[in-house]
Regions:
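Positively charged n-region of N-terminal signal peptides that target proteins for export
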Residues: 1-4
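A structure-centric signal for secondary-structure junctions around beta-strands
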Residues: 80-82, 135, 209
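Bacterial N-terminal signal peptides
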Residues: 7-17
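C-terminal cap of thioredoxin/glutaredoxin-like
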Residues: 24-30, 34-35, 169-245
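Extracytoplasmic thiol/disulfide redox context detector
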Residues: 21-127, 195, 240-245
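Short clusters of hydrophobic/aromatic residues that line enzyme substrate/ligand-binding pockets
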Residues: 76, 162, 227
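Solvent-exposed, polar/charged alpha-helical surfaces in well-ordered, non-transmembrane soluble domains
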Residues: 32-35, 39-42, 46, 86, ...
Length: 245
């Protein structure tokens, strides 16, 4: 796990500026988003300095990924949709936030709501985001009250407000039983499941957040391309059209 964290730090340090430039090219970053990106880079640099900067990975990054069984994973859309997107997310990641307030809404309208794509949510909380694990467990706990996607959306839009009190406040606004939610989060009952997602992300070659598998539905699984970063809708649209042929 430590090796994964160190490698992820290096990969994120390389990927963040590229995604930031892509975001700027799409219409510019807000001042707040720019500040979040700078803060992310500073945190990564500080952790790399403490752990010792790793050598740049020499192996070529994987471009394909396959998961055979997504049974039990939180899903939006029709289970019979011909195409699948799996996201590995970190609720404290500013680029995950950017994806969900931009490209995701377009994907949902064009593909998920029309029955063409089923969208699965998995977790990849990074160690240098202290509130990310709590948020991942909170979303799963919200699922017990049939509010997984609602709480996920609110937390994803507020990556800097993921301490326990803010999460409970979000839950209250969503008319959830906040005592039940707090008890569930405190129990750590979903921690092992979140960590299983992280190990799976390592196995397929994910090296930053958000990471996606975009491809054909194969039974209860997916076989497709590995995509890293908050890419624009146009990129997802092109890949989905390619897999629709």
């Amino acid at each position: 796990m430590k090796k994964f964290v160190v490698y992820s730090l290096f990969a994120c340090a390389a990927v963040l500026p590229l995604v930031a430039q892509s975001a700027a090219d799409q219409g510019g970053l807000t001042r707040q988003q720019g500040d979040q990106i700078l803060q992310e880079l500073r945190q990564i640099r500080q952790l790399m300095e403490r752990q010792g900067k790793p050598a740049q990975p020499q192996e070529e990054a994987p471009t394909k990924a396959k998961i055979s069984d997504l049974t039990g994973v939180n899903m939006l859309g029709s289970k019979n949709a011909p195409l699948t997107i799996v996201e590995y997310t970190d609720y404290q990641c500013p680029f995950c936030q950017r994806f969900h307030i931009t490209a995701f809404n377009e994907i949902k309208k064009a593909y998920i709501d029309t029955g063409k794509v089923r969208f699965f949510s998995k977790d990849m909380p990074l160690d240098f985001h202290p509130n990310a694990m709590r948020a991942a467990m909170a979303a799963r706990c919200a699922g017990e009250q049939n509010k997984f996607w609602e709480l996920r959306d609110v937390m994803g839009a507020n990556p800097n407000s993921l301490d326990m009190e803010h999460i409970i406040g979000f839950a209250g606004d969503l008319k959830m039983n906040t005592q039940t939610l707090r008890a569930c989060i405190d129990s750590n009952k979903y921690k092992d499941m979140v960590q299983t997602d992280v190990l799976e992300a390592m196995k397929i070659g994910a090296n930053g957040t958000p990471t996606f598998i975009v491809g054909k539905s194969v039974g209860n699984g997916v076989d497709g391309d590995l995509v890293v970063g908050a890419m624009p809708f146009q990129m997802f649209d092109a890949k989905l059209k390619e897999y629709s042929k």
